[in-house]
Amino acid sequence: MKTSTFLKIAAVIMFLYFVGHTTGAPWTVGEAPADIAVIEAMKSDHFPVMGVSRSYWDFFFGFGLSISVFQLLLAVVLWQLGKLAKTDAARLRPIITVFFVAFVLNAVLGVMYFFIIPVVMAILISICLGLAFMTAGKRDS
């Protein structure tokens, strides 16, 4: 397969990652009374932050939405890199490397703090990026 194909596959997986993350909003997993109590405490305790009043829930929910925005951005950028790879894939190797390292670290963080689905998505994207890197050095990428 060609570099552009691996990058576009990574883009599609990233888009699915974005869809999964975004449809999971508000990212609360528990329905037990203790879980609900924690969520309500996150919503009710406000504190000043740089001149505005925020809660832990505001940060939790806001960061979740921010992650969705950046996931969509990554999907679009990976797709665009796939298009660029058709003309000069070798020049994309430094960019592919940066994305590869970021997704490997994302997988590690997923293992440490989250659950299997984001880990699998990050690993699949890392594999695609690794293969894109390897094929980008060849002439007919």
For each of these PLM feature ranges, what is it?
Residues 9, 13-16, 63-66, 95-98, ...:
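Physicochemical signature of membrane-embedded alpha-helices that form the seven-helix bundle of GPCRs
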Residues 1-8, 51-58, 87-94, 112-113:
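Juxtamembrane loop-transmembrane helix junctions in multi-pass integral membrane proteins
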Residues 26-33, 83-87, 111, 115-118, ...:
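Transmembrane helix-loop junctions in multipass membrane proteins, especially transporters and channels
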Residues 87-124:
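Hydrophobic alpha-helical transmembrane segments of integral membrane proteins
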Residues 7-32:
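N-terminal signal-anchor transmembrane alpha helix
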Residues 2-3, 75-92, 137:
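Juxtamembrane helix-break-helix junctions at the cytosolic face
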Residues 124-136:
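Alpha-helical transmembrane segments and their membrane-interface exit regions
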Residues 28, 35-81, 101:
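Core segments of alpha-helical transmembrane spans in multipass integral membrane proteins
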